[in-house]
Regions:
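Beta-propeller domains with acidic blade repeats across secreted/periplasmic ectodomains
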Residues: 20-378
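Beta-strand cores of secreted/periplasmic/IMS beta-sandwich domains, seen most often
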Residues: 49-50, 55-56, 64, 196, ...
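Surface beta-strand/loop "capping" patches
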Residues: 374-401, 408, 552-553, 561-564
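Acidic, Ser/Thr/Gly/Pro-rich low-complexity segments and short DxT(G/T)-type signature motifs
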Residues: 375-380, 400, 466-521, 525-526
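N-terminal edge beta-strand
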Residues: 375-376, 537-567
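Short, surface-exposed alpha-helix to beta-strand junction/turn motifs within ectodomains of secreted
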Residues: 394-437, 464-470, 480-484, 584
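Extracytoplasmic beta-sandwich strand-turn segments characteristic of Greek-key/jelly-roll folds
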Residues: 428-438, 442, 590-637
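Extracellular/periplasmic metallocenter environments
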Residues: 521-531, 614-663
Length: 663
């Protein structure tokens, strides 16, 4: 803690600095330092713990625990590694208790202790146990200690083409007593790899899947049901605080917030993470308790994303007793999939990563990196607050008042997701949120965006773009968009028109509800997506190809050869447990097409993440897990090395193949 305070004092002068004289990059403010790891160690991190003596403990999916000396890379810059434990079953957590460790394996929490001080665990005690089905998807997480000393574990659902709870308490959060007793706390969880405390309350992160339209972060209280009904199989068991049964959960496709108003016990999320826009698989999170050593976001939450290899930032607030808030992009460019994060003794952040079987945009199989604030002040939206008539943005440093008062500097939309059994959801009910007025504070640190209260929708994600806001030096925000989940609207006195810095010319708000069924949301007819055999193919296709997937974000066929001008039928069989598509592109354009799909924003799901470009020749729809789709096309007449790629965001860099067209 002394080191943290010292760092904060040294950096105090930087906190008042304005944005840099040239447009900033993330690396200017938060530097990623990669820890060198010996080639003989497969450091597929499942858990991290910082020890008081400065060492870093890491559990790995290979069943080992390593003690890492000099993790801050001081002196000669070389860390040391000593294996502390081995033979564990894919541990995905690690808790240091001083004299021992608690670690979750697939089927138990194990207590590890070194009683003879030789640096190697000689005690492996079974601390708490639960049954297993043998399903590959039965991951177990924790334990995590709460500020009051209570311990928590979470148990992942099975995957059988859908989420299932094939053994007791799968899909639940459980409290773990000092005697090893497990007490059920809440259910509705699907893949709860990230959980812990924020301001003393319990939160957990969730990944898109069945019954989960997009990633989210939920405040869990005893007896809550967070959405996936598989775990309700055990709600009648002794000790269950949950009263709902699977039959109580409607599969109507209405938004989760609306369903929760009708079915007591369902808990809507505090914050949604719009899928593919701010990640695809939320993982660990950490509240910033560094007292400024990590920059200007003390008290906020940083959330890892395994699939996109990024960290996002969440600014929470409690309105009418309900947690809600904004998620912002924060830092991209990590080497692998982020699964664990922990604060170092100096206020930097250790980031443990792995991608085997799960895949990630970071191309390394695993790694440990450290994220360090450089002391420079990023020009960012620091907070967004709910107001009775809109939102107030607080910036990290003063804005250029002229640009901040320009009505064209902002664009607001709201949208949500379906709550249904289908895997994921398209964005639905998109609606523009027109501005009425703008109020820029005298000190330039706050901007109030005033709207007609009638267009604010509870339970909806409100996209707040501030692309036109500049610093006094003329630089844009480092990240220009935030996504505010509006569960409650703050009370207070609305701003009067006489207080506006800018009065926005009135226009009729678009109240249209662009609701699209999940099955039809991205199935618009297209000559590039033909899913019925053309009638003039009287003799059928000349060639039929069936292509599937293998673990690691790969197609199971890396190369296909077809004759120029031939009639082709490709059956894409998605035998994976995540969403994919199949897009055939011109030679050498797969990466560009994939990047364009990534940048589609709110329109991505509607377009099946297939950008409208001449580089796309043919494509499938987004295909759900365990489903398939056939497409028909005539092969190009020009021979060449064409490509096929999955353009679902985060997949395109790895999931590619060659379509060789020959004479």
């Amino acid at each position: 803690m002394k080191n943290i305070l010292l760092t904060a004092l040294i950096s105090a002068g930087c906190l008042s600095a304005y944005a840099q004289s040239k447009p900033g990059k993330e690396d200017d403010y938060y530097r990623i330092i990669t820890m060198p790891i010996p080639e003989t160690i497969k450091m597929e991190v499942g858990g991290l713990a910082v020890l008081p003596d400065g060492r870093l403990a890491a559990s790995t999916r290979r069943g080992e625990v390593w003690m890492i000396g000099n993790p801050y890379l001081k002196g000669d810059g070389k860390p040391s590694f000593q294996r502390f434990a081995s033979g564990l079953h894919e541990p995905l957590g690690l808790l240091s208790r001083g004299k021992d460790f608690l670690i979750s394996q697939r089927g138990e929490v194990t207590r590890l202790e070194d009683t003879n001080n030789d640096g190697v665990a000689d005690v492996y005690d079974s601390f708490a146990r639960w049954p297993l089905s043998g399903n590959y998807h039965q991951y177990s997480y924790g334990p995590v200690a709460m500020p009051n000393g209570e311990l928590l574990v979470t148990l992942n659902l099975d995957w059988v083409g859908r989420g299932a709870s094939q053994s007791k308490w799968r899909g639940w959060m459980l409290k773990l007593g000092e005697d090893g007793k497990l007490t059920p706390y809440a259910t509705g969880l699907r893949s709860p790899s990230g959980f812990g405390s924020y301001k003393g309350d319990i939160f957990y992160t969730e990944n898109q899947g069945d019954w989960v339209g997009s990633g989210r972060m939920t405040h869990l209280e005893k007896g809550d049901f967070a959405g996936n009904p598989a775990g309700l199989r055990w709600s009648k068991e002794e000790g269950s605080p949950v009263k709902l049964t699977p039959q109580d959960v409607p599969n109507t496709g209405e938004p989760l917030y609306d369903v929760a108003k009708k079915v007591p016990g369902i808990k809507p999320p505090a914050v949604w993470f719009p899928h593919t826009i701010v990640g695809i698989s939320t993982s660990d999170f950490k509240e910033d308790v560094t007292n400024g050593a990590f920059g200007p976001f003390a008290g906020q939450v940083f959330v890892g994303d395994q699939g996109h290899s990024i960290i996002t930032r969440v600014d929470f607030e409690k309105v009418n007793g309900v947690w809600q808030g904004t998620v912002f992009p924060f830092r991209e460019g990590f080497m692998s999939g982020i699964i664990r994060m922990v604060w170092g003794l100096d206020g930097s952040m250790f980031v443990g990563q792995t991608s085997r079987g799960w895949s990630a945009t970071g191309k390394a199989d695993f790694g440990i990196q450290r994220l360090v604030w450089t002391g420079k002040m990023p020009f960012e939206m620091k907070n967004v607050h709910s107001m009775p008539d809109g939102f107030e943005i607080v910036f990290t440093s003063p804005v250029d008042k002229k640009s901040a008062a320009d009505q064209d500097a902002y664009k607001l939309n709201s949208f949500t997701y379906k709550y249904h059994q289908t895997y994921g959801s398209p964005i639905i009910n998109t609606q523009e949120v027109p501005l009425k007025g703008i109020v820029v504070s005298e000190d330039g640190l706050r901007v109030r965006l005033v709207v007609d209260p009638a267009v604010l929708r509870k339970g909806y994600i409100h996209e707040i773009k501030a692309e036109g806001v500049k610093s006094p030096d003329g630089n844009p925000l480092l990240h220009t968009t935030g996504y505010y989940t509006l569960n409650e609207i703050a009370s207070g006195t609305p701003v009067s028109a006489s207080q506006f810095t800018t009065t926005v010319k009135a226009s009729a708000p678009d109240h249209s509800m662009h609701t699209m069924p999940a099955e039809a949301s991205n199935t618009a007819p297209s000559a590039k997506r033909v899913i019925e055999m053309p009638k003039d193919w009287t003799n059928g296709p000349d060639q039929v190809v069936t292509i599937g997937t293998v673990p690691g974000l790969k197609f199971d066929i890396s190369s296909i050869q077809v004759k120029a001008g031939s009639r082709i039928k490709i059956i894409f069989n998605n035998n994976d447990d995540m969403l994919h598509n199949l897009v055939i592109t011109k030679p050498g354009t797969a990466n560009a097409v994939g990047e364009a799909g990534l940048n589609l924003g709110l329109k991505g799901s509607e377009l099946s993440y297939v950008p409208r470009t001449n580089d796309v020749l043919f494509h499938s729809n987004i295909v759900e897990p365990e489903k398939s789709e056939a497409i028909y096309f005539v092969a190009p007449k020009q021979p060449g090395a064409y490509q096929y790629v999955c353009t679902f965001p985060g997949h395109y860099t790895l999931m590619q193949g060659k379509l060789n067209v020959v004479k």
